[in-house]
Amino acid sequence: PWRFLPYTDLSFTAAYFDQSGLYAYGRQPDAALWNLTRLGGALTPVAETDALNEGLQTFPQAFERAMVEAFFARLGLKPAGEGDFDFIVALLQWMEAARIPFERVFFDWFGGAASTMRALAGPHAALYSDAAFAPLRGKIESFAPDDPSRLAHPYFGGA
């Protein structure tokens, strides 16, 4: 449901029944860990508690790796290693502060530096030219594209 947000809002929840925001986009890691913890509790009659706890302790790192892979795939970029997760967090914070549509950044900056001209000619050029975006733009442009040939697809032909 995040694809259809009018702008990035990490507190948005698409679940009509979620009055407390437990399943808000920005709380997904906490909600997933909470759910896994509940599952671990249910498994204690048939599994060792220490083994269950060990497994739960690997979740934060596994989530960060998965998030890096997913976001970089959406951006059509190759992860660089250390600092990639911090970049994603900073990008999401900027997206929310700028109130830019969630999908827009992924389209505008797909492939990194090769998309700079398209991004700066698009409807959100002013946001991308703002000083607040400059460090993120520098990072995006520094990442290697995953498959530059994908930019030849007609999808990227217009803003």
Locate each region found by the language model:
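Regulatory N- and C-terminal appendages and interdomain linkers associated
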Residues: 21-159
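Flexible glycine/proline-rich, aromatic-decorated loop/lid segments
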Residues: 2-17
